[in-house]
């Protein structure tokens, strides 16, 4: 039996970008641990099927929240939906993220060089990896501060520790998310709200990338990750369980690299 501090039964969790991938993995574990969850995505077919799948498997109340959380009105709609359904938010997981593998500036002398990021692509990468977390934290924060209780978990990336080839803007956003985590944690520390981050390494998802690409990613991870394998989506959920529970009450402002040793 786990210590009581790990018990999150009855907690209300809001997870962005949770229709698939890491967000879905987090939702599955937290629901298994007894939490009721609002999972957000912009694509109805992913978020609705994921909500139904997790609800059927765990018996918990899982609701889909379809909204663009990179925009203020979308965030407000999402938070209003969660508050109407559950009356509170105990844990916010800012998981939304995406990368475009292109350089900031086209690299000369490379026959296969990718084109530089366009203005629209640059804005997209910053919005989904950083702006979303800021907007959602701003919207949920007043509810947590009023109750003097809450957990915010930001999902960063291993690239925040050492950069990522042809992913400069993505790295900028994920590194800024680490700074945001530290600054917001300090500002809210005296109000009983903890803010921490997880920086995942390589976690292939066949649903997101397709079976073949996920297999290739796993093979690459076996070569370059010190622990010799890619991560499993569930493993991010297990760490999120710790950060969502009272077991982590004395931790705030920290970023935990869950990357099989890639950041060493």
Predicted features and spans:
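A glycine/serine/threonine-rich, flexible loop-to-helix segment
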Residues: 4, 52, 105-112, 190, ...
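Conserved glycine-rich cofactor-binding loop
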Residues: 12, 17-21
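C-terminal substrate-recognition "lid" of short-chain dehydrogenase/reductases
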Residues: 15, 149, 229-258, 263
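Conserved mid-core segment of classical short-chain dehydrogenase/reductases
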Residues: 76, 84, 99-123, 146, ...
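Catalytic Tyr-X3-Lys loop
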Residues: 98, 111-134, 149, 153, ...
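Active-site helix of classical SDR
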Residues: 137, 173, 181
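Alpha-helical segment proximal to the catalytic Tyr-Lys
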Residues: 142, 186-187, 249
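Short, small/polar-rich loop/turn modules that mediate ligand/substrate recognition or access, typified
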Residues: 189, 194, 251-253
